[in-house]
Amino acid sequence: MAGGGVVVVSGRGLSTGDYRGGLTVYVVMVAFMAACGGLLLGYDNGVTGGVVSLEAFEKKFFPDVWAKKQEVHEDSPYCTYDNAKLQLFVSSLFLAGLVSCLFASWITRNWGRKVTMGIGGAFFVAGGLVNAFAQDMAMLIVGRVLLGFGVGLGSQVVPQYLSEVAPFSHRGMLNIGYQLFVTIGILIAGLVNYAVRDWENGWRLSLGPAAAPGAILFLGSLVLPESPNFLVEKGKTEKGREVLQKLCGTSEVDAEFADIVAAVEIARPITMRQSWASLFTRRYMPQLLTSFVIQFFQQFTGINAIIFYVPVLFSSLGSANSAALLNTVVVGAVNVGSTLIAVMFSDKFGRRFLLIEGGIQCCLAMLTTGVVLAIEFAKYGTDPLPKAVASGILAVICIFISGFAWSWGPMGWLIPSEIFTLETRPAGTAVAVVGNFLFSFVIGQAFVSMLCAMEYGVFLFFAGWLVIMVLCAIFLLPETKGVPIERVQALYARHWFWNRVMGPAAAEVIAEDEKRVAAASAIIKEEELSKAMK
């Protein structure tokens, strides 16, 4: 959905009027079903750390870790889970996801958003079933790779699809539905792990349900409408108008449809190869850098270190296995509740405000965690921490989770999905997902080794990065709240810093935007004149 009305160009940026359509029951249902794709990523992220701490799973696949846990702590308790095979199990999914999302951009542009979602769902079903029946480490990794292919495809296409079907005034709310379902998936995984913690083959019941969100996405792709943008791009103009009218709940979509058609006319002659080539020109460099860097920042908040390894972390600090798994459920519940706040307020307060506030909150929480662990382990050495201290650390981690869940979590997916023009969107969103999976792989592969080597310092490491993130959000990120997707590039062209990065292309973008503003204004005036004459 184009999202936006007449744009009034001012000296400082863009403001928007209203298109005729608004939030309808139909568009909410469509967004809800597509956002279920977030369950794929969420369930897998949530189940990974918990299943690793299940006794039967450890004995079968990671006997070295199990043996180390049974020994008296003579070395640092931070090193209990420092195991190469365990790190490969966690991070292999993200390596596969990185590969699949490179192909996802081609599939999305040529076969459509629906087909891409269907293929991603099918991969996830296959991966969940393979893991549920895994007999050895090799089979486990194959299942993880299949899951990675599914997550890569889903993560690339679902945010893009949501941005294209959502009305601009509610784009943030509906797009964050994806992140909300990621958090719901994490919570469900925590509940499943806790429920099966004492079962001999409970780990199979933890890994197997991963097929369920894949099935939901696959079946949903059969009934969801294709996005108007893709239909127009493929020459199905009238069908695109019909879908847009249904999404908007009104037949008066001329201005919005004109925006979509104009954007498609620019993008149509551009091949996928040209789309990738265009992305690396100065004209599109601001969006490219924003998209990639925000993925780096999202992962270097330390979020996946927490989500992957919450049970592992608390086990390392001396908590009993059941208590460690229960802590995961608590963290998951806080995650869901805080993401709901982002759903309600992202279109009210804007992206930058949430990133800045959330970044400061996360930084203080990481700093507190590092300092408390340094002080307490100096007191207790390799002995388990007292329950009161562990509970305090859990509370601080929940503060971190809440800050992330209404800021860098949802904005890390929302912002890249709304800043690219149609001709660069497939390649641009692919770059965002590649960045996300690349840095998720790095964190998944390295965190337990970092924890072993840096001890409490690993939390101070993430706190330092959070300071940098907040400063970048303050000075370098344009506010995209309420700005139509097709005109976000003009927002960058008028930004004090990105204007210089774009060079002469900035003036070209501003001139093109002014022409489109005039055209959209003329269409609306015609409509008003026609109504007045009736």
From Swiss-Prot:
Membrane topology note: Multi-pass membrane protein
Chief localisation class: membrane
Key words of the record: Membrane, Sugar transport, Symport, Transmembrane, Transmembrane helix, Transport
Stored Gene3D superfamilies: MFS general substrate transporter like domains (1.20.1250.20)
Induction text: By glucose.
GTP-binding recorded as keyword: no
InterPro entries membership: MFS_dom, MFS_STP/MST-like_plant, MFS_sugar_transport-like, MFS_trans_sf, STP/PLT_plant, Sugar/inositol_transpt, Sugar_transporter_CS
Subcellular localization, as worded in the UniProt entry: Membrane
A single GO cellular-component term on record: membrane
Family the UniProt entry places it in: Belongs to the major facilitator superfamily. Sugar transporter (TC 2.A.1.1) family.
Protein name according to UniProt: H(+)/hexose cotransporter 1
Gene: HUP1
